[in-house]
């Protein structure tokens, strides 16, 4: 299977795992060893501004815009770890380029910049991540658990989390509710 890096996984309507039900996961890494991604449509009920205060990263005097974005549950693995998906900027301590439109940073310095003129233009903050071991994701796709689409910055950064699953399914080009949950091979 080709790499699904910079793709969205869209949970099938028949997925009965309450944690991943109606989830959209942005795949940050996918290779022969496994996959890592962030769920991008499940708010935890905390605003980014409140998270920064809890971390004692108070808004700087250069604060230039309002923070009304929500912190998301990235997945069940390492829920104490924070991740920021953002538009490209190269000056963070621990950043990885995922695509020409998206980077992943897991260092505290990016959080300290949020809300200032040094902040990335667009960002998503998540706690925890979703991970798959070797061949696990491929098997879940074969089992009809996930559908995939190429990620777009518009969907990642400009759609409210609560609307993302519906918007992502509309990108598929067919009515997802018409799909069978049965898997088979002719």
From Swiss-Prot:
Write out the GO cellular component annotations: cytosol
Protein name (record): UPF0301 protein Sfri_2850
Annotated Pfam families: DUF179
**HAMAP family, A to Z:** UPF0301 (MF_00758)
Return the similarity comment.
Answer: Belongs to the UPF0301 (AlgH) family.
Q: Which SUPFAM superfamilies match?
A: VC0467-like
């Amino acid at each position: 299977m080709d790499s699904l890096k910079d793709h969205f996984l869209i949970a099938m309507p028949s997925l009965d795992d309450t944690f991943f039900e109606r989830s959209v996961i942005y795949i940050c890494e996918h290779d022969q060893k496994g996959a890592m991604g962030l769920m991008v449509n499940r708010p935890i009920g905390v605003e980014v501004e409140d998270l920064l205060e809890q971390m004692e990263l108070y808004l700087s005097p250069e604060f230039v815009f309002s923070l009304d974005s929500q912190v998301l549950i990235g997945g069940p693995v390492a829920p104490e770890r924070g991740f920021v998906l953002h538009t490209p900027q190269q000056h963070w301590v621990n950043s990885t380029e995922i695509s020409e439109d998206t980077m992943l940073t897991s260092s505290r310095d990016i959080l300290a910049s949020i809300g200032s003129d040094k902040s990335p233009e667009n960002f998503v903050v998540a706690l925890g991540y979703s991970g798959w071991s070797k061949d696990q994701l491929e098997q879940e796709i074969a089992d009809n658990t996930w559908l995939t689409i190429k990620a777009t910055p518009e969907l990642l950064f400009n759609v409210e989390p609560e609307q993302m699953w519906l918007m992502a399914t509309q990108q598929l080009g067919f009515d997802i509710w018409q799909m069978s949950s049965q898997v088979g091979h002719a």
